[in-house]
Amino acid sequence: MLNALYPLARPLLFSMDPEDAHHFTLNQLKRAHALGLSGCIGARVAPQPRTVMGIAFPNPVGLAAGLDKDGAYIDALGALGFGFIEVGTVTPRAQPGNPRPRMFRLPAASALINRMGFNNGGVDAFIRNVQASKWREAGGVLGLNIGKNADTPIERAVDDYLHCLERVYPYASYVTVNISSPNTKNLRQLQGASELDSLLGTLRGAQQRLADQHKRYVPVVLKIAPDLDDDQIANIGDALLRHRMDGVIATNTTIRREAVAGLPHAEEAGGLSGQPVREGSTRVIRALCGLLGDAVPIIGVGGILAGEHAREKIDAGAQLVQLYTGLIYRGPGLVAECARALAR
C-alpha cells in the first residue's frame, strides 16, 4: 500500500525541510509497524539467498548507513523487504553534528547534499536500541557502522574505532569502518596508504581478539569514497588484500559538483548522493573488482534509483547493493524493484 501512496505523499514531504521530512517519515513508519501494519508498508520481496562474508543474506538489497543513525527504526525499516540493514554511523560519544540546515534536495538531479557530521547519541545509546530490535533477534542481517568523534584528533582516530568496534561487536552481523565521510574534518586522510595500513592492522588484530573472546567471528568491512584516482584505488585494494579484509563498501558520497553545476544548493558544502554519484561509484567498484577478484567481497552503493542501476553494480563486480537516496526519490517500492532486477 505504501508503495502506491508514496508518489502522492512525496510532494508533501518535499515541501518540508529535508531533515524534518526525514524524521517525520521514519516516525510514521515506526508508528505503522507498532500498530501491526507491517504488511502495508513494503512490497513482498521473493527470497534470493546468497552467502557473502560467511553471512546468509535472504536477498542482496540492503539499506545503506545514514538513514537510521541511532538504530532507532530497525524493525520498521526491516518491514520494507531489505535483505540486510546497516545503521549508524555511531561514534564513541554523543555529538550534535553540524549546524542546520545540513541537508539539501536537488530534485532536478535526483540528488541530496548532506553535511550532517555524524550526529548521533553515542555508542552506548546505539547499543541499547540495537538490543531492543526484534529484527536482530529474528536473525535479520544487521550491519553496524562506526566512526570517530569530530573532536578526536585524526592521529588518535584509531582509538575511537577500537572503542566502537569493541562495543558493537557482540551485536553485529558485520561492522563497517567508515573512513570516507566528507563531513568530518580530515577523516578521508585515513584512506592514505600509510594511515590505512596502520588502521586496518590494528582493527584486524582487535577483531581476532574479539572473535576469540565472544566465540563468534564478525566480519569487518571498509567504506570508501568515490573521489579516488587509480593510484589511490590500487593502494586501497592492496591494503584490503594484505590485511585480508572481509569486505569493502563502494562508495560513500562525493564532493564533486560538475554534475549539478548551476542547480539550487549545488554549492552547499557536504557529500553529494543520488544520481550524480552513480557512475563514479560504479567506476570504483569495477576497478576494485579487477584488483580484488573474489578475495574481498564488494557491496555496491551510490546512485541506485532503479532496478537497472542495481544490476549495473552487480555487473561491475559487487555481490550486494545498498540503497539510500533512491528511497527518498522513489519510495520503498524501489527495494522490490531492485530485487526483481537482480533475480533476472
From Swiss-Prot:
The keyword Lipid biosynthesis does not apply. Signal peptide: none annotated. Keywords: Cell membrane, Flavoprotein, FMN, Membrane, Oxidoreductase, Pyrimidine biosynthesis. One of its GO terms (cellular component) is cytoplasm. Its cofactor is FMN. FMN binds at residues 65-69, 89, 145, 178, 223, 251, 274, 303, 324-325. Substrate binds at residues 69, 114-118, 178, 183, 252-253. Its main location: membrane. Pfam families: DHO_dh (PF01180). Catalyzes the conversion of dihydroorotate to orotate with quinone as electron acceptor. Monomer. Belongs to the dihydroorotate dehydrogenase family. Type 2 subfamily. This is Dihydroorotate dehydrogenase (quinone). The gene is pyrD.
